[in-house]
Each structure stands twice: as C-alpha cells, then as structure tokens.
C-alpha cells in the first residue's frame, strides 16, 4: 500500500490524542476495520478541496494540501544525509551540552532504527527481516565478545541459556524460543505481536536520552482532537513529526521508522529551538558562520562548482544601482562567470512549517518571500547588467567586469521543495504568486540541484538544459517534477522536442533516476499484494 505511511501517521495521531485506557488488545477484525476507515478518510481529505471550477488559486491551494497529505521526503537519501550532517554537525557542542548526546549519535541512532524494527518481521515473500536480524546479532556479538568464531572466546562463553541466550537477555525486544536457541519472527500482519515488533529497546544511556527527549505519551497529542477548523484532520497533528517515539510505561515504541527518517531536519531544529537564544543567534541569524542561511549559500556554491569546474563563482557579489532616486548597493548571493555564460544565482533558505501548509496563506506568503523574491532579485541583477555600459560586481577577489555579449542565466535555488507548484507556471502567474517576467528564471531546490550535479557532465550540457527549461517555463507547458524533466532530457531527447509557443504536458521519467540512486539503498520490504 503506497499510502500506508501516511495512514500509519494518521493512526498514531489519533492514538496519542487520548489516554490508553483500553483493557483488551484489538482483534484482527478491529485493526482491519480501523485501517479501512482511515484509508477512506485519507481519500476523502485528498479530494475535499479539489477545485470544481477553473480557478488558479483554488488549484494551487489543492496542490499545497495534496503535497502536505501525500508527499514524504524532498530528496534522495545520500543527499539528505549529506546536507543534514553538514548543516547540524557544527552545532554538536550545543547538543552535547543541552541533551548530553551529539548530532553524530542522534544521526546514527536514526539510521539504525529501521533495521531494529524490520529485523523482527519476515514472511514467505521476503527474508529481508531475517537477514537484518542476522546482521543485528553479528554486530552485537562482535561488539560484546570480539570476532565471531574465535576459539578462545568460544571456550570461555557461557551457553547455559542457549546458543543466543546472552543476545536475547541484552535485547529483550527480540522474540525467541524459551531455550534461547532460535529467533522467532513475526508476520507483517501479526497485530498481536505489535508490542514486540515496534518496541525500541535502548542499547545504552545515550539512546535512552535520545528517546526521552523525543518521545510522547498517550494523551500528549490532545490538541489533535481539540475544537478547531482542523479537528481530527489528516493535516493536523504535526507533533508526531517532532517527537516520533511513544513512551508507554518504561518502554519506547517506534510505529513507523520512516517518521524520524523523513523529518531529520525538523527534529534537529526543534531540539535546538528548546534553547531560543542559541537558536536565534547561531542558527537563524546569517551573521553566524554556522547558521542555516550561510551554510545553504555555501552548499549551493560548492554543488555548482562540483559539475561546472570551469566556472568561477563569486559569493556575495555587490553592485551599485539607483532605485526611485535612492542609491543602493544590493548583494547577489552568487555570481558565476565562465567563457560561455554568466550565472546570476539567488539562494533562499525558507522552509514551510506544517502550519504554513495546512492554513495555505503561510505557504503562499513564504512562496512569494522565497521563490518570487529570489526571481525578483535575479531580474534586478540582470537589469543592472543590461543597463550598464561596463557592468561590474564587487567581490572579495576585486571587481568582476561582465561581458554583456555572453548569455545570462538566472537561477533561484530554494531549500524548500516546490517542484510540483513550479510545474504550473501559468497558474502561479494568474494567481499573482509569480510575475510574467520571472518565467525565464530556473527555480530549483537544493536537493534537485544535487541530482543535476550528479548527472550533468559538462557546462555545454548544462546550458542546453537551462535553455530547455527556459522554453518550458515560457511556452505554457506543465510538469509535475523537475526530475522528470532532467530524466527525459538525459534519456529521451526532451531538449529537441520542446518548442516555443507549443505547450506540452510532461509526465514521468524520474523513475530512471530513482533506480540509479536505489542501487546504493536497497529498499527493504515489498510484500507484493496486500493481505486482507
């Protein structure tokens, strides 16, 4: 079930909104009925505000809510992990002092979570869980007793409680036979075994501190059912994304390991926000060298340089203009210059909160403050170049004179992922969220830019892609995903198919890119047809 993750989140929100006063475990029939009801509500919410007339603002509202309900994750795992580490590791001293664990320890714990749950599940369709259980045992065995198979170690071992008795004692969340000789696996639909399957047993004090800082108890999520416009809505209940674990008695549970995986940035940021002074000074303000804004600008520059080695990039390039009779000295985030082109790059680190997405106005305001504002600033820089006889930017390396005979490309890079909205440029312009003159700016998220960097092999190829993107944005075409365009550009000659004044609907293609990245990240569980 491709929507199982969202439905599980919905169930967790309901479950944590009230005390756990039930005395009896639910039967299989009750669980299946609950799942079907939640699935029906899920479908209802998807179509609840679908536009019934051709109104661009209604369409955009629906798309924002659709993304909020359905879309999970903004980038490929290797890119997400890379950016997370680079953004938060400089703050590890703060986490150590505030929570007594490091960012590295938090990250490693999250990375191990999925295996700790999956390793308890097996079926006729897959032995993935069993292989992960073997890996878990091997890791524990070597850490506890040294190399497996060492004769001296084996001679001194106490096997009175069974071959795996010591492991079972140290890992009480793993089901086993009474003699300690065999592991017992759970079927995917073994609802009665949920207490064991989703139990996360801390291996040390660090893990206990992590779990304590990120756990909710039954009843803590009462706001989910409080009287409001979004009472019990699938778009309510963001607390489970900030605190993804459940504490019941002295046990901790993780009912879907994907929640911490999908919300790495949110969780780390919310932890930091518990110390408002540090958060504002060191993470929010761009005067701090380890702030989010400073990092993202630096990351965009390094990503661009990684696949455009012959382009010189200048951060924080200044230029002088006069607007409405007032002299100004605006700053361009990144100026790129090569023998072939000039790149005008603006970077925005805005993020949409869950509240922004649900209430819509916040999402649209932040879209304008990030995407539209970045496009506006790009246009201002290009206007300066075109309006000057000898346009020059001030940089740390000195003045950089721009050759006006070279083509100029405007690029706006955002941290937030807006790909599906940006594929509806006509609607964005009609709804006044974008201006007509912004169409020829390539707007891309940092994570999509990292994919482009992995696949584009030369500046000439990149310029061809930018030329294609300019046509798509200006010829009233529509698309769903930037990576669909990239894949069709690389594999299907899309650049030769797009034409000015000939709109296209461009769908599909990104699965080819998915497959390339999936080679490094084996996707664990696919039980085929869903069991009822």
Predicted features and spans:
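Acidic, metal-dependent phosphodiester-chemistry machinery of nucleic-acid enzymes
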Residues: 1-294, 298-306, 311, 324-327, ...
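Active-site metal-binding core of divalent-cation-utilizing nuclease and nuclease-like domains
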Residues: 314-332, 336-339
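Short, solvent-exposed loop/turn and secondary-structure capping segments
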Residues: 346, 356-357, 423-424
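Extended, hydrophobic alpha-helical segments in both membrane/secreted and soluble proteins
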Residues: 300, 330-334, 345
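Active-site beta-strand-loop-beta-strand hairpin of nuclease catalytic cores
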Residues: 336-344, 348-354
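Beta-sheet entry/capping signal
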Residues: 312, 333, 340-344, 407-411
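Short, solvent-exposed loop/turn segments at secondary-structure junctions
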Residues: 320, 350, 417-418
